[in-house]
Amino acid sequence: MIYNFGAGPSVLPKEVLKKVQEELLDFEKSGMSVMEISHRSKSFQEVIDEAQNNLRDLMSIPQNYKILFLQGGASTQFSMIPMNLALGKKAYYAISGAFGKKAYDEAVKLSQTLDFEAISLGSTQSEYYNHLLKIDTSKVDEKMAAYLHITTNNTIEGTTIFPENLPEVNSVPLIADMSSNILAVDYDVSKFGLIYAGAQKNLGIAGLTIVIIREDLLNQKESLSSMMDYRILAQNGSMYNTPPTFAIYLAGLVFKWVKEQGGVKKLEAINHQKARMLYDLIDQSDFYQSPVLNKVERSICNVVFTSPSKELDALFVQKAEEKGFKSIKGHRSVGGMRASIYNAFPIEGVLELVKFMKKFEEENK
């Protein structure tokens, strides 16, 4: 049995893969694959409309928010966000992980040629991002602030800002990179001005990014490139140009699957259960260690851990691969191991990993 612990691209629901397989050569008796039908066709319009409606239902997205299905990875949003929202203002960033730093660095780069200021509220990089930044919102100039940017789940480092710990920002739009825990943790969308997420973790496959943006934040100036302008993309229903049709179709199937599982709250409870099995073992062991300083900040999507040495880490990864546990090696920047147990990851796989970890500890103490 193969278990895919990859951080993204990652495991997909078996039911979704079977549906794709079933429809691959003949989508809804059209005689064509979904990869072949026109994005301007009635059939595909129904696909994107249904996907949008199901995502709105799953996340209880208010009607004054637009849902965009965009090309490229979430990293493209590191540029699009300040270009659309920050001109003439101050853009604030709270940095608790590598991807948060990338977002800030991109804003700094853009601020050298565009009229806005990129400001860091602090970073935990010097502590290897082993805890979340304590965000001091008193440093935010509310009159001049375009937004405060956070990352809700740090995929590499294994930390999460859970809903109860979101910063209080008053009138300042809160922007979240939710790439690795969207639909895995239940957030109140109305607390955010903009949410974005690459699809290849909890939503589907690479090549698609979903943006959820409050209508009042849509750019009103004509100065932006059309492909980088949220307003134009929203006005055209995510089809200003040819969208990533297959990725949207597949995301739509994932949304249906999430609904069939009972919705986001139900899956979040299961995700807590899966993560707890691993964290309980780690906490009770003298052999394994979690690098995350505060237990309440531990991710339920990306469980990061180490053994007593780099040599044992390498042996663990090797033996795990032989056992059928794929892509469990930690990110190259931090080492160790990382078990990414997103929505589609089966609880049986976690139970098997726990057994393996216990046996590995016994054999290598």
From Swiss-Prot:
Pathway it works in: Amino-acid biosynthesis; L-serine biosynthesis; L-serine from 3-phospho-D-glycerate: step 2/3
Amino acids binding pyridoxal 5'-phosphate: A74, S75, F99, T155, D177, Q200, N241, T242
Residues where L-glutamate binds: R40
Statement: the UniProt record of this protein carries the keyword Cytoplasm: yes
Cofactor binding mode and count: Binds 1 pyridoxal phosphate per subunit.
Cellular compartment(s): Cytoplasm
Record key words, sorted: Amino-acid biosynthesis, Aminotransferase, Cytoplasm, Pyridoxal phosphate, Serine biosynthesis, Transferase
Any one Gene Ontology BP term: L-serine biosynthetic process
Cofactor (UniProt): pyridoxal 5'-phosphate
N6-(pyridoxal phosphate)lysine: residues carrying this PTM: K201
GO molecular function, one term: O-phospho-L-serine:2-oxoglutarate aminotransferase activity
Enzyme class, first EC level, given as a word: transferase
Substrates-to-products reaction catalysed: O-phospho-L-serine + 2-oxoglutarate = 3-phosphooxypyruvate + L-glutamate; 4-(phosphooxy)-L-threonine + 2-oxoglutarate = (R)-3-hydroxy-2-oxo-4-phosphooxybutanoate + L-glutamate
Similarity comment text for this entry: Belongs to the class-V pyridoxal-phosphate-dependent aminotransferase family. SerC subfamily.
Quaternary structure and partners: Homodimer.
Function of the protein: Catalyzes the reversible conversion of 3-phosphohydroxypyruvate to phosphoserine and of 3-hydroxy-2-oxo-4-phosphonooxybutanoate to phosphohydroxythreonine.
UniProt xrefs under HAMAP family: SerC_aminotrans_5
NCBIfam families: PRK05355.1, serC_1
Official protein name in the record: Phosphoserine aminotransferase
Native species: Lactococcus lactis subsp. cremoris (strain MG1363)
Gene: serC
